């Protein structure tokens, strides 16, 4: 009994220590959560300077480092295309890779504004061509979003990745959806996968069909995009059938789109077309009319050659007329 009585105070002290540690941990967690909520409130209200002050004071993040910094004069000069001011700021020692609270760099701003000279100056000063914002946006994405082929080419020359993982916003899909076929041309020339499938978007061809961007659809198909790959079980023809463009539907059919393909609802493209529309009539007519032997042969030969070797078609010992036919020229 005496041993138990002596050990009891120690057990109580030990439990008190654990309780104190737990209390301190909970208090610290509460303070951090409160500060995070407060910072978010200031950000939403547009007071990023106050958010930066909180971060610097409580998290030990220096505002000079730029991680939580507001837009710098360099950001402003880049976004407005003021080249002379940009060069002056760089000569004064401003960080070329300074980021805002959203991790936007001056290069992001220059590309978003299609300011090629500013973008070149930043890249020559050491700007990161693959900088990523908190939303996963790169300078190349901004360039393709604005249709700036010059900025896109410049970024790629300075090491920008033409294609990132599927979890990041895709410059290819952005260019295809907005009809910026010149940017798409450049990306294709730099070796992108024209069939890159992003789960919530589908392939670039599917996106282009949804947005009715004929020139981008043509560029993708000419580059060898798979006419059957869309979004999940929906093919590009499913997407085009829901739109009014007969030109796009005819183009897809010419490149071998399967008129009998079914999506997850077991619906064919013709089932999705507006009743009594021109698109529905074309699909029904194509369904009832067999493809010509020339068309079937062209599709068969192209499939056999493969997308990676389309550029070798001119080397085949064939008449120029047949070469052009195989290349849809």
Curated annotation (Swiss-Prot):
Annotated function: May be a substrate-recognition component of a SCF-like ECS (Elongin-Cullin-SOCS-box protein) E3 ubiquitin-protein ligase complex which mediates the ubiquitination and subsequent proteasomal degradation of target proteins. May play a role in the initiation of arteriogenesis.
Free-text comment about domains: The SOCS box domain mediates the interaction with the Elongin BC complex, an adapter module in different E3 ubiquitin-protein ligase complexes.
PANTHER family hit by this protein: ANKYRIN REPEAT AND SOCS BOX PROTEIN 5, SOWAH (DROSOPHILA) HOMOLOG
- Pfam families assigned: Ank, Ank_2, SOCS_box
The family database entries (InterPro entries) matched by this protein are listed as:
Ankyrin-SOCS_box_domain, Ankyrin_rpt, Ankyrin_rpt-contain_sf, ASB5_SOCS, SOCS_box, SOCS_box-like_dom_sf
An example Gene Ontology biological process: protein ubiquitination
Q: Which domain of life is it from?
A: Eukaryota
Q: What's the protein here called?
A: Ankyrin repeat and SOCS box protein 5
Listed SUPFAM superfamilies: Ankyrin repeat, SOCS box-like
Species in which this protein is naturally found: Mus musculus (Mouse)
Q: Where is the signal peptide?
A: none
Recorded name of the encoding gene = Asb5
Protein family membership? Belongs to the ankyrin SOCS box (ASB) family.
**Pathway, per Swiss-Prot/TrEMBL?**
Protein modification; protein ubiquitination
Which UniProt keywords are present, listed alphabetically?
ANK repeat, Repeat, Ubl conjugation pathway
Q: Does the keyword Repeat apply?
A: yes
Q: List the lineage, top down.
A: Eukaryota, Metazoa, Chordata, Craniata, Vertebrata
ANK repeats (start-end)? 69-98, 102-131, 135-164, 167-196, 200-229, 232-261
């Amino acid at each position: 009994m005496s041993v138990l009585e002596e050990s009891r105070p120690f057990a109580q002290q030990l439990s008190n220590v654990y309780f104190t540690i737990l209390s301190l941990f909970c208090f610290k967690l509460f303070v951090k959560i409160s500060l995070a909520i407060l910072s978010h409130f200031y950000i939403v209200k547009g007071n990023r300077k106050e958010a930066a002050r909180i971060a610097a004071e409580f998290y030990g993040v220096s505002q000079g480092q730029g991680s939580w910094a507001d837009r710098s004069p360099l950001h402003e000069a880049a976004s407005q295309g003021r080249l002379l001011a940009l060069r002056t700021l760089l000569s004064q020692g401003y960080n070329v890779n300074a980021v805002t609270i959203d991790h936007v760099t001056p290069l992001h701003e220059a590309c978003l504004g299609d300011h090629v000279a500013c973008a070149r100056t930043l890249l020559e000063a050491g700007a990161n061509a693959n900088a990523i914002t908190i939303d996963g946006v790169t300078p190349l994405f901004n360039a393709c979003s604005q249709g700036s082929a010059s900025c896109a080419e410049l970024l790629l020359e300075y090491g920008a990745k033409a294609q990132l993982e599927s979890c990041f916003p895709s410059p290819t899909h952005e260019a295809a959806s907005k009809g910026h076929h010149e940017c798409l041309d450049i990306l294709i020339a730099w070796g992108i996968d024209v069939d890159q499938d992003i789960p919530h978007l589908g392939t670039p061809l599917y996106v282009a069909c949804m947005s009715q961007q004929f020139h981008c659809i043509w560029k993708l198909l000419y580059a060898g995009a798979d006419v059957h790959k869309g979004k999940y079980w929906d093919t590009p023809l499913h997407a085009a059938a829901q739109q009014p463009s007969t030109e796009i539907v005819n183009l897809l059919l010419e490149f071998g789109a399967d008129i009998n393909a079914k999506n997850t609802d077991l619906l064919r493209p013709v089932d999705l077309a507006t009743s009594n529309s021109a698109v529905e009539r074309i699909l029904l007519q194509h369904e009832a009319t067999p493809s010509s032997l020339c068309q079937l042969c062209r599709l068969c030969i192209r499939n056999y050659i493969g997308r990676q070797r389309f550029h070798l078609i001119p080397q085949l010992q064939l008449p120029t007329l047949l070469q052009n036919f195989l290349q849809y020229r």
